């Protein structure tokens, strides 16, 4: 959306960015006005970054108006001071504004300089972007996500085959650390799904540009789902599964990672597997969208209504004792009976 509407920073904002990156500015608030990115307000340094944080950030958040906030840390990298990039999109703001700000987020980062940004936060409530929320975000990102058996196998492949053509110079050499950014159209689709305005998203990895791209958001019923799964390439899918459970009507978001076995190259398999966890972290933590179930499949034919229901609501398997013969009377059993011949019972032959 950003490139379609032509939203860019004003010359004044660009000039302020250049001065602020390594100056005494602690906070920059950016808003969209008349289809341009403009300076909303700014704050000068006072104390240490964590002492200034809540006092500066929270007072600038409007409950009905999205905005971007760039907050300077006290740490530095090779390009200068490191910054936090906050995207504020309150629940009570108009949907059109939410979409506009979501789609323009990448432009703000580009105009400011992505190399200066250490962390990104997306919030709809103040507690999401407060200092405590930021620390939780950092802690969760630092914790390695659990790996499936398939991912452990792929991790071993990656470690043992460092000389493959995969280029990840700017990323960690572990599956947990590999992350491709979402393109604006993909971010917009996730917000629409969260608001239940669409019911299906298909995403792909651009292996050359190293981004997560939107394929389409076609309306999808359960019977359509198998046909959405490509047979020759991997994909990520989000599906709003509408169903009834124990008398309640539910709408559960299901994530589907489709990988058609060894029809894909090793490079594609490794990248899709390694980017999956970070994508899910972003959807759950940055977009605050709850995912009821995460599924991995090879073939779209697996996706039936019964299969999805059992995945979202797994049956409680009670322990069933094998059939046993009824026990005899309590106490010691009598002597074994003997089959007697004629006359042995006192009867006449």
From Swiss-Prot:
UniProt subcellular location: Cytoplasm, Cytoskeleton; Cytoplasm, Perinuclear region
Keywords: Actin-binding, Cytoplasm, Cytoskeleton, Repeat
Pfam families listed in its UniProt record: Cofilin_ADF
GO molecular function: actin filament binding; actin monomer binding
PROSITE patterns, A to Z: ADF_H (PS51263)
Principal cellular location given in the protein's record: cytoplasm
Annotated disulfide bonds: none
Keyword presence, Hydrolase: no
Domain of life assignment: Eukaryota
Record text on subunit structure and interactions: Interacts with G-actin; ADP-actin form and capping protein (CP).
Annotated protein name in UniProt: Twinfilin-2-B
Lineage, uppermost ranks: Eukaryota, Metazoa, Chordata, Craniata, Vertebrata
Gene encoding the protein: twf2-b
């Amino acid at each position: 959306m950003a490139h379609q509407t032509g939203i860019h920073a004003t010359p004044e904002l660009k000039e302020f960015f250049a001065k602020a990156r390594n100056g005494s500015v602690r906070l920059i608030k950016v808003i969209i006005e008349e289809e341009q990115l403009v300076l909303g307000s700014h704050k000068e340094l006072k104390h240490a970054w964590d002492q200034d944080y809540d006092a500066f950030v929270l007072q600038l958040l409007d409950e009905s108006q999205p905005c971007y906030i760039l907050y300077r840390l006290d740490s530095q990298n090779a390009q200068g001071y490191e910054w936090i990039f906050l995207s504020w999109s309150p629940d009570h703001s108009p949907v059109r504004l939410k979409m506009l700000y979501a789609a323009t987020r990448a432009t703000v980062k580009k105009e400011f300089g992505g190399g200066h940004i250490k962390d990104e936060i997306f919030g709809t409530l103040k507690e999401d972007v407060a200092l405590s929320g930021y620390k939780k975000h950092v802690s969760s990102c630092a914790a390695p996500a659990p790996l499936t058996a398939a991912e452990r196998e792929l991790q071993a492949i990656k470690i043992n085959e460092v000389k493959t053509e995969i280029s990840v110079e700017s990323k960690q050499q572990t599956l947990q650390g590999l992350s491709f950014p979402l393109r604006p159209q993909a971010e917009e689709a996730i917000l629409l799904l969260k608001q239940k305005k669409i019911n299906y998203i298909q995403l792909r990895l651009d292996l050359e540009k190293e981004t997560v791209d939107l394929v389409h958001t076609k309306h999808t019923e359960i019977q359509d789902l198998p046909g959405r799964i490509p047979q020759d390439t991997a994909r990520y899918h989000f599906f709003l599964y509408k169903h009834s459970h124990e008398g309640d009507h539910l709408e559960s978001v299901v994530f589907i990672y489709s990988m058609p076995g060894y029809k894909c190259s090793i490079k594609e398999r490794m990248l899709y597997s390694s980017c999956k966890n970070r994508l899910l972290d972003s959807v759950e933590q940055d977009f605050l969208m709850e995912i009821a179930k995460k599924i991995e499949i090879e073939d779209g034919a697996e996706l039936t209504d019964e299969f999805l229901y059992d995945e979202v609501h797994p049956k409680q398997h009670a322990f069933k004792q094998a059939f046993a013969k009824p026990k005899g009377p309590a106490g010691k059993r009598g002597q074994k009976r003997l089959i007697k011949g004629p006359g042995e019972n006192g009867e006449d032959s």
